[in-house]
Amino acid sequence: APAFSDACDREGMLFWSEVSFWGTAGPKVDGGWTASAYPVKEQDIEGFERNVLRQLEEMIRIHRNHPSVFVWSMCNEPFFTDGKTIPGVKSLLKKMVDTAHRLDPTRKAAVGGAQRPLGKDRIDGIGDVAGYNGDGANIADFQQPGIPSVVTEYGSTTAGRPGKYMAGWGDLGRDEGWKGREWRSGQAIWCGFDHGSIFGENMARMGIVDYFRLPKRAWYWYRNEYGHEAPPAWPQEGV
């Protein structure tokens, strides 16, 4: 919504604006939220592609005059799809990139969640910018990819509040997906805030700030890592 991009402009936040072309792990059965990211049935393809391209155009026309938007992202993890549809995924992404360039020549087009597939079916080079979620930052195939890249989902740990700091595979202390790599732009934590989700309660509690917009312990940990501001004293068991 324009209210969101207005807020990003006002607060000085970068906005990775993304189309809702995505997939997720689970059975690739039509009718459920784990279904194939790209249609399995031929009769569904034309309508699906038309809808995705229309959403892309709407997104760009709504937000393109907002300085907080620094990239247009075509997707998130579309590799969670029926294996035989990968050619269709790649073809649609190319159409989307061309459309984004036509509607807004001033911004780059990104392929988000591009850490799979590997080998000949890679999708990370289809756009101008590649976003590698999670372990994709360290996969050999994606080192020095030849285009700008960023770690687009880093962390993904579930915690409550006040909670205990949960160090996941994205822990800054041991993750080298971006440090010292001049060809990688940085990383974005997944995620800022707890949120509603069709994935269930646990998948919705990966924020470093909870539903009530109160910081979890992880928030203070990141503040210390980036801003060198020590966290508060925490209650000790039995005290």
Where are these regions (language model features)?
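Glycine-rich beta-alpha junction loops
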Residues: 78, 156, 191-195
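Substrate-binding cleft of secreted/luminal carbohydrate-active enzymes
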Residues: 170-204, 219-220
